[in-house]
Amino acid sequence: MSTEAQRVDDSPSTSGGSSDGDQRESVQQEPEREQVQPKKKEGKISSKTAAKLSTSAKRIQKELAEITLDPPPNCSAGPKGDNIYEWRSTILGPPGSVYEGGVFFLDITFSPDYPFKPPKVTFRTRIYHCNINSQGVICLDILKDNWSPALTISKVLLSICSLLTDCNPADPLVGSIATQYMTNRAEHDRMARQWTKRYAT
């Protein structure tokens, strides 16, 4: 009886001891594995991002130099501050249009994928236009599906100026203004001039 009792007593303490030893080893080893893996992952992500930023930043710097030396008619654009990816643009209402005399401010945001993805361009100044909504979003094909890396921000601004001269009621962003443009042009033009005077001068 005493021998059996001794075996029973010895058995748990031996297995318990080895189990504690295993646990201590696994606890000590696992954090090391967890620390090493994320570092490798972060390194890969940052190198890809750095390459994208380098490519896009060079292209944006080049376009900035070009638009500074030779800006499109009635347009100007450049970085808001130190961030090369955030620009502010000014467009003067085209002469002879219902927006003549207005000064319109736009925000331009380039992504790290530029020029392979279009810039985001929005009006900050309110404007009465069937292709520009109240949030300043512009319905322009080259800012969507017809974008090409061969295009530049200068060409985008020229296209926006053309849109101010000749709107596209066939592809409207604001249906009510497009309908008014086609059915009551005089009232449309009166409203557009009124908004220009109120918000853009």
Curated annotation (Swiss-Prot):
GO aspect biological process, one term: DNA damage response
N-acetylserine: residues carrying this PTM: S2
Entry keyword annotation includes Ubl conjugation: yes
Region feature (Disordered): 1-55
Annotated keywords: Acetylation, ATP-binding, Nucleotide-binding, Phosphoprotein, Transferase, Ubl conjugation, Ubl conjugation pathway
Biased composition annotated in UniProt, kind: Basic and acidic residues: 1-10, 21-45
The record's account of how the chain is modified after translation: Autoubiquitinated in vitro.
Positions with biased composition (Low complexity): 46-55
Domain of life: Eukaryota
Entry keyword Nucleotide-binding: yes
UniProt-listed Pfam families: UQ_con
One Gene Ontology MF term: ubiquitin-protein transferase activity
Catalytic machinery residues: C139 (glycyl thioester intermediate)
Functional summary from the UniProt entry: Accepts ubiquitin from the E1 complex and catalyzes its covalent attachment to other proteins. In vitro catalyzes 'Lys-11'- and 'Lys-48'-, as well as 'Lys-63'-linked polyubiquitination. Catalyzes the ISGylation of influenza A virus NS1 protein.
Name the record gives this protein: Ubiquitin-conjugating enzyme E2 E2
Organism name: Homo sapiens (Human)
